[in-house]
Amino acid sequence: DLDPHRPFVDDVAIQCPECENTAHRVPEVIDCWYDSGAMPFAALGYPRKNAEQFAQQYPADFICEAIDQTRGWFYSLMAVGTLVFGESSYKNVVCLGHILDEDGRKMSKHLGNVLEPIPLMDTHGADAVRWFMLASGSPWQARRVGHTAIADVVRRTLLTYWNTVSFQSLYARTAEWSPATGAPATGERPLIDQWVLSEAARVARDVDDALDNFDTQRGGRILAEYIDDLSNWYVRRSRRRFWDGDESALATLHEALHTVTLCLAPYTPFIAERVWQDLFRATDDQAPISVHLASWPSLENATINDDLRDNMALVRRVVELGRAARAASSVKTRQPLSRALVSAPGWAQLPDELVAEVADELNVRVVEVLGEEAGLVDVVVKPNFRELGKRFGKHTPVVAQAITDVEPATLANSVRASGSFSLMVDGNSEDVYADDIIVTESPREGWTVASDAEESVAIDLHIDDEL
């Protein structure tokens, strides 16, 4: 048997049938990585042929391999390309982190913790594995892969998307609604409809930008957050409208899901295709025959409303504070209450339609502006001697006394609003910060209050006969 390695191959001599000279092994040996580095042009036979194809493909837009290729293929591609053509053979590179098991150990046959990709896809679906690898975590970091982790991303995002599609399909059929039925113009729909469509346009724009920059994680995060907003805020807040067959709600959810499905297609091609066929092709015979033949969502006629985005974000923060206030008082949301008072920058300018969303969500008759929070909360401010001691040393007792001399609500509100409060200590001005004081707030009897930064919600707990 011929051994093609040195030194045995050195003894091999081949007689040339044409020139009758003897051919021996070339004594110089080039690094085998040169072949890999020459791949972009050698695979095409360039420069002897395929010049036009080479010009279209070189340099490549993107390359990815594991971190160990930094000194291997990544380097040889860059070195050979730069040497021959004066530029690297790729524009963008990602060094993938290693795949670990769920306990953070390197996968190995010895440990018996190797997960084969095909059985993993058979269990969870190819799209679940794709979504996990593309969207959950930075690709350059080591990643723990296991059944639990993949099942979790399916539950939180893909299943939520699927259930929202099923919800739309069910209520559209019940109302005998289709896109051909028509709906009011976007600007004539309720603000919550305008908001969710504005955010859909924002998602299309931002996911497009993320994918153009090869950042699948950012694009996936944007999609996951929007799917959660769509299901757990828009659909939940609009549920009664769907029960009533409201055309505006049905059209809005259909349009939002259309955008989401197109944006999901590069991540989850099989689920997106199934939804495209069942929800969009089934209701529009002019739609492309596949989601993968459809155009990316057009922003030409879309409106991205930043003010509405900020207003809805404020509404949702106030709702969270209201829920926290109710939870603190052990009064469940099922119990109607008379009023909620809100103190927050921008609240007084909020449209009545969005204020009504808060009232309905918190199950109160009215929501009003909270004029003076101190009237509903007993505030106690104590010096934080540990933090004060770090700054003032032996002068800490004097500073602590100056803190206790200030009206508590005034001091607490100032620190909350601006981050500090100026005190006069022995004729000198000293700033007190949030870490320097311990603030305790207790609602007055009959009220429950929750606060965060500059925003507060107070709920009246008095229940009259009607309530």
Please name every model-derived segment.
Residues 138:
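Active-site loop segments of alpha/beta catalytic cores
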Residues 132-135:
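Structured mid-domain segments that build the active-site/substrate or prosthetic-cofactor binding neighborhood
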Residues 1-34, 38-40, 46, 84-126, ...:
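Feature 926 captures the class I aminoacyl-tRNA synthetase adenylation module centered on the KMSKS loop
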Residues 63-73:
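N-terminal catalytic cores of NTP/NDP-binding nucleotidyl/phosphoryl-transfer enzymes
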Residues 45-54:
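Cytochrome P450 heme-binding Cys-pocket and its upstream "meander" loop
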Residues 54-61:
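Glycine/charged-rich beta-loop-alpha catalytic/anionic-binding loops adjacent to active sites
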